[in-house]
């Protein structure tokens, strides 16, 4: 019986000795440059590997698009999503980072001086043609920006994920 107990205790000890502590990945602060169309110098055409190198703390990676999902690297806790196959970023209302200029929460009526007239206008969003491609701004019922998308594509070629 002692032998059995010693063998059992040895196995438990060996298994716990193999357990390793792993440090969680820490990301640098997210910095969005609206006028240049980048996030920490990453552009909408950046590949998943480039994004992972700068931001190793993603919450989900989808390598290949499917019928129900677009490929990309996602940071749900930071409310920022990189859709790599469609070449755009999406920044939500709970974004944890800096946006320059600080558009999140800005009034729809205050954008003309900065962005000019939108190329496409809808009730709840505007699409602006930028030097890098397209900036799409979404508005809440109060007319304040609550989501934005930065794409390397023109408004005519833009395809967004659902």
Predicted stretch roles:
Residues 123-132:
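Extracytosolic low-complexity repeat regions of secreted or lipid-anchored proteins
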Residues 18-123, 140-162:
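Short helix/turn-capping signatures at newly exposed starts of structured segments
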Residues 4-13:
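Sec-dependent N-terminal signal peptides
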């Amino acid at each position: 019986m002692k032998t059995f107990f010693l063998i059992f205790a040895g196995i438990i000890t060996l298994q716990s000795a193999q357990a390793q502590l792993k440090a969680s990945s820490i990301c640098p602060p997210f910095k969005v440059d609206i006028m240049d169309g980048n996030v920490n110098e990453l552009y909408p055409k950046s590949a998943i590997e480039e994004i992972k190198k700068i931001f190793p703390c993603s919450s989900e990676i989808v390598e290949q698009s499917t019928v129900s999902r677009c490929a990309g690297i996602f940071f749900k806790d930071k409310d920022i999503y990189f859709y790599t196959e469609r070449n755009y970023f999406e920044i939500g209302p709970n974004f944890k980072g800096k946006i320059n200029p600080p558009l999140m929460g800005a009034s729809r009526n205050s954008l003309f001086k900065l962005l000019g007239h939108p190329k496409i206008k809808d009730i709840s969003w505007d699409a602006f043609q930028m030097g890098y491609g397209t900036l799409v701004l979404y508005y809440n019922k109060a007319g304040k920006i609550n989501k934005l998308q930065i794409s390397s594509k023109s408004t005519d070629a833009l395809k967004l994920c659902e």
